[in-house]
UniProtKB/Swiss-Prot annotation:
It holds the Pfam family RuvC. One of its GO terms (biological process) is DNA recombination. Mg(2+) 2 binds at residue 69. Binds 2 Mg(2+) ion per subunit. This is Crossover junction endodeoxyribonuclease RuvC. It comes from Albidiferax ferrireducens (strain ATCC BAA-621 / DSM 15236 / T118). The active site is at 7, 69, 141. It is found in: Cytoplasm. One of its GO terms (cellular component) is cytoplasm. Mg(2+) 1 binds at residues 7, 141.
Amino acid sequence: MRILGIDPGLRTTGFGVIDVAGADLTYVASGTISTLHLDKGQLPARLKVLFDGIREVVARYQPECASVEIVFVNVNPQSTLLLGQARGACITALVSGDLPVAEYTALQMKQAVVGYGRADKSQVQEMVRRLLALPGLPGPDAADALGLAITHAHAAKALARLAQADGVMGAGSGKYKAGRSR
């Protein structure tokens, strides 16, 4: 399975692509989409750069699914709103290509990648480097995006195991039925 991770940002959005085969995680690509060349007042143009950039990444690497970081509420409400718009442009680009999108908080990603939800950026970078056997540290935005892809790989495996357990338990005496509990 090929997974695209997205760390949305209005100035710099990170992306990371990994392949997952069983327990093996393989690095495919990572990078950033930058709007730093545009003035702050050009919000629609910046959102279009993000939308087009994500569409280009999807077309080039053909992921089967994507994971995006959930926006946290910042002290500055204006910053939170702007980040939400950047995130919306990224998600719209993904779903316009019919990609399923999973969402994870930064805390969930850090917990999955480092084992500690309050890890700092350098710890995330180092663990991503180790997990993907990279020769050097990825940049912070690309590392977060790769971390989101790794998080989704772990979550997808756990969900598959749960579904398999549901099927096994549901095939027994007929007393257990998968689905809603009553």
